[in-house]
C-alpha cells in the first residue's frame, strides 16, 4: 500500500516516484508525489483526469508538456496547471535529470493503485518497449481506475464499449488491477520520510 515516503521505481521508463501525500493522509484532498525522470525517459501517453485538477511544480531540469493544444517548457520554479478533463502529456525535455512535484486534487485511491501497479509492471519488465501496458493488462487496470485517468486514444466511446469486454477477458487470463506483490516490500520502499 502506498503511503507517505513510499518510493517506487520504473526501470523500463526511467522514472522514480516518491509519495508526499496520499488520499488517506490528506482526507481525500491531495495526492502529491515527486517524480524524477532520467533524460530520454518515457513520454507519458496523452490522458485526462475526469475529476481532478493536476498541478506540476518544476524543481529541477526541463519539463516538457502538452496541455490541450498548448505545448510548452517548464523550468525550475515554474508551476503548470492542467484543468479537470483536459488532455495532457509530459516528458523530460532536457539533457539532465528532471524533478517535478505534482499534485492531484482531490486525492483518489485509484491514483495510488494506478502508480503502484504500473510501476510494478515496469519493475518486472512487463511493459512494452514504448512504456505502455499490454492491451489486456491496460484494459483491466484502466477500467479499475477510470475515475482517475482516461487515455485519449482510442476515443472514449471505443474505450467505453470495448474495455469492459477486454478487461473481463484479461481477468480470465490472470491480469489484475492490483497485485499484492507490488504493494509489499521489496516492491515498494518505505523511506520513513
Language model segments and positions:
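Short, charged/polar surface micro-motifs in flexible loops or helix N-caps
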Residues: 27, 38-41, 62, 106-110
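Alpha-helical membrane-targeting segments
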Residues: 110, 114-193
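Ligand-binding loop in jelly-roll beta-barrel domains
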Residues: 84-114
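Residue-level recognition of well-ordered beta-strand positions that form the cores
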Residues: 34-36, 62-64, 101-103
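A short glycine-rich, His/Asp/Glu-containing loop-to-beta-strand
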Residues: 9-46, 52
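Short acidic-glycine-tyrosine-enriched beta hairpin
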Residues: 55, 69-87
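Glycine- and acidic-residue-biased ligand/ion/polar-headgroup-sensing regions
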Residues: 51-63, 68
